[in-house]
């Protein structure tokens, strides 16, 4: 099987076609310009620097360009980084397309849509079900295509819906264990908690923040969407207020982006399972490329920790 980008170890030489996920111009200490690139294939992404760039390089090596690259894997502050030796733009003769380099969810969109729909059908509270169903229908195309984040966790095509499916499974297990949990409120919170990402983020390819994402953020966006759809459906019960609280508080703390801490049971559960699924996704990503008996590279989204991969099963 052909090795992919993250399969290479420090010290090994890379000779691959890769997709440029991001390209940012900088100035080195010697005053010369360089490009800071994030390069990706289906295995994940690595940072690389292209030094002493010319004006033409900025156009040739911009976002969404496919390049053929030779270089070396290095260790930079506990993380793998790619040192570029040779780089060129891919041409039509190379026969490669962007879709070949984009990581996607391990479950296809149709299966995820069927599973999420089943959870909505199980909801008994008519108001919560109608709001959830209407918002999902409004944004369903983007919901099943978008990543869950720009970086850190589920940052791949269909990552948003995969994150939701994983959380719904966790939510069901929690509700089975604790009968006092309001399943309808919890399921609605899980399905809608990151729906604002379809407005906050630019899309599944070379994802950036939109103007709304930079100025408002996905939490405020989804709460506004709930208010609008509730008005359209003439729903004004307590469910609307409590659902908005569950969504507002799902980051848990003010310093993490939530204006209110969780103050109802389902809000606390949503926060915890969101954190769990995101954390495990980040761990799985680095441990997949860590040999047994060794520590992973540092994970910025998890307090810059390195994780150990045990030798036993």
From Swiss-Prot:
Molecular function in Gene Ontology: 3'-5'-RNA exonuclease activity; DNA binding
Nuclease keyword on record: yes
E.C. code: 3.1.-.-
InterPro entries in the record: 3'-5'_exoribonuclease_YhaM (IPR020873), HD/PDEase_dom (IPR003607), HD_domain (IPR006674), NA-bd_OB-fold (IPR012340), NA-bd_OB_tRNA (IPR004365), YhaM_exoribonuc/phosphodiest (IPR050798)
Span of domain HD: 163-279
Ranges annotated as DNA-binding: 22-90
Keywords associated with the record: DNA-binding, Exonuclease, Hydrolase, Nuclease
Swiss-Prot/TrEMBL GO biological process terms: rRNA 3'-end processing
Gene3D superfamilies assigned to the protein according to its UniProt record, in alphabetical order: Hypothetical protein af1432, Nucleic acid-binding proteins
Family: Belongs to the YhaM family.
Function text: Shows a 3'-5' exoribonuclease activity.
Protein's UniProt name: 3'-5' exoribonuclease YhaM
